[in-house]
Amino acid sequence: MKILQVITSLHTGGAETLVVNLVPRLRAMGNTVDVCLFNGEETALMRRLRNENPGIHVWTLGHGYYNPLYIIKLARIMRHYDIVHTHNSSPQLFVAIASLFSRTRLCTTEHNTSNRKRQWKWYAPIESWMYGRYGHIICISKIAEEKLREYMGGAWTDRRSRRYSKITTVNNGVDVEAVRHATPDDVLLRAKAGRTAVVMVAGFREAKDQDTVVRALSLLGGDDFEVWFAGVGVRQTVVSEMAVSLGVADRVRFLGMRTDVPRVLKAADIIVMSSHWEGLSLSNIEGMSAGRPFIASDVNGLREVTKGYGLLFPEGDAAALAALLTRLRADAAFYQSVAESCYGRARQYDIKDTAAKYDDVYRALMEE
């Protein structure tokens, strides 16, 4: 099959990482897989994609995300492929419109349980039309599927309807063993100097809650812990200013955009994901793969993977997070038990299984 993955960009993020992880595995199954980017800016993930996939064609439409001229370009490009698979909002909509001028089969992945558009009631009919153009809609977790059906309503919730069967769940996956056996970053190992290092890998954006991690650090006192934030984004300045105001700036490290996340995870002692909402976080699964205890906010998209394996704290509850961090540092047996349980859970979300299920979806579409 000739498959085109369409996404906004290859800046670091969950959907972007999933695409880069999927491409070589789908190619190994005998498929031709190319990528189309709305914003073709050179990034670390772009370089990795090219290095791991000799001969791949990367189509770049421009440098923005919402240029309507992209629809014309997409209509021309799509004719070269059997399957076009979209990720993120603007590619979903623009490809749906472009499909009016192409017979290519369409698939999309819904990566979130919530977004701002779902608060716009007037937009729901547009999304219903858009999703109706797709032969299949993959949700990255069961809760993401439930929330999408709830939002769409109508035939999307009626088991007798053709539209109902268009939506299925394929859990996100990561290369679990690559994370497990990564070499810790030497610079970070030396820098923590006996402190317990708590790392959160996430962009500084609306859905993420680095603020609670900083507040938890301020409650711990002493000099036993430090926090590492790997990622960039519009809220980084806010979080940095909070660290200063709470008197913990000397124990918070902003690592910036990292292309060696497994090495960062292995250098840390505890891994945290503090969020307001998620789809199914790849950082969640990566964190649980590292052989370290994983702590997450008790919210949709994190709860489903973490509960019963890692540790959960109420959303925004810095005191509860601080208490869990304290116990993990003080109780070696508890620390080891949680770490082993997390790794066992992560193995249920291996990228090999994700790729095989995506391939099954594509083959089913080809038979329709």
What are these regions (language model features)?
Residues K2-Y66, R149, W156-R163, G233-R235:
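N-terminal strand-loop element at the rim of the active site
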Residues G13-P24, T196-L219, V234-S240, A319:
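A conserved mid-protein helix/loop that constitutes part of the nucleotide-sugar donor-binding site
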Residues Y65, L69, R149-E150, Y164-R190:
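Acidic anion/phosphate-binding donor-loop and adjacent secondary structure
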Residues M78, E110-G135, E146, G154, ...:
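A conserved, positively charged/aromatic
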Residues T86-F94, E110:
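Short His-centered aromatic/hydrophobic patch
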Residues Y134-K166, V174, A178:
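A short, active-site helix/loop in glycosyltransferases that binds the activated sugar's phosphate group
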Residues M257, H276:
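Aromatic "clamp/platform" in nucleotide-sugar-dependent glycosyltransferases that forms part
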Residues A296, L311-A318, R327-A332:
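Conserved acidic donor-binding segment of nucleotide-sugar-dependent glycosyltransferases
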